[in-house]
Amino acid sequence: MPRSFLVKSKKAHTYHQHRFVEDDLPIFTWDPITSAFTAAGDRDKTPEDGKKQDLEWVVPKQEKDSFQPKEESVPVQYLSRMLPGPSAQDMSISGLQVKDCTNPTSMPTFYKTGFSWDAFQLPYSYRQMSSTMQSALLEHPVSLYGSHLLPSAEPPLDYSMRYSSDMETYHCVKCNKVFSTPHGLEVHVRRSHSGTRPFACEVCGKTFGHAVSLEQHTNIHSQERSFECKMCGKTFKRSSTLSTHLLIHSDTRPYPCQYCGKRFHQKSDMKKHTYIHTGEKPHKCQVCGKAFSQSSNLITHSRKHTGFKPFSCELCAKGFQRKVDLRRHRETQHSLK
């Protein structure tokens, strides 16, 4: 091993001391005339000559005899060897400034020179990604409704909607609700505006606007309700419904009306209440054109046109379109509560 790679110490050997980052770097000398590096350290030279030669990469030959403090730039070739990644020319970093490194009394070893390491701590600069790189990153399989990054080239489905290519969203032209997929908008139009509920329960005849809603409803007839309220004994099919029901007993109403301040247990109830202030009636009957603020009122109204009576009295078999009418019939005609 060349002698210039070793740092002598009177207290302990080098393997007993902490190593510095500079210890692992090879020492080179730089000739400002030829702009070339040569390995420092020769077996024939004394330690004093080795120390002087170790400083030759910092102090040019013209100035090392005068020992006048002067700032000098570290050559770009050495900078490119020390910095990983892009070269110094590509990073456009100015030369390192050497400060007060020519005083031989204040310099115990070659790796404790006084030049500034600030330039090595500069972060990399960021540039705009090229169009070629952007197109390469955007290559991926197209999903069912088109890319989630790029708008679909095909025209949107006609569900009385307005399509925004900038945000990949679908707007209902009647109530301005926004949906992320055309399927979601289709279900919304069918439920809220068209009044069409093509999915009917074979047991009780209740209709739904979506197949998933019908599937969840059929579980009521086929399975036992397993979630029971311990305060009133009422049972529910889903735990989420029980959690909403418990708000009634705790009198927790986290959703206030922005117009009158009235509070509600559920956000949907608050939204239905706001239609009283705004006068909005988004649910319209397709037969007679009558509009309603709540979809449940539209469902009940549509039974007048179809003649469907899902609620029947178990004593006289008389049918009713509304549950409240059946309850009133039981109280008045059969004295039941």
Swiss-Prot record:
InterPro entries: Znf_C2H2_sf (IPR036236), Znf_C2H2_type (IPR013087). It is found in: Nucleus. One of its GO terms (biological process) is regulation of transcription by RNA polymerase II. Residues 1-20 are annotated as: Mediates repression of transcription. A zinc finger (C2H2-type) spans 170-193, 199-221, 227-249, 255-277, 283-305, 311-334. It comes from the Eukaryota. Keywords: Chromatin regulator, Developmental protein, DNA-binding, Metal-binding, Nucleus, Repeat, Transcription, Transcription regulation, Zinc, Zinc-finger. The keyword DNA-binding applies. SUPFAM superfamilies: beta-beta-alpha zinc fingers. PROSITE patterns: ZINC_FINGER_C2H2_1, ZINC_FINGER_C2H2_2. Essential transcriptional regulator necessary for development and differentiation of erythroid and megakaryocytic lineages. Alters histone methylation by recruiting histone methyltransferase to target genes promoters. Plays a role in heterochromatin formation. This is Zinc finger protein Gfi-1b. The gene is GFI1B.
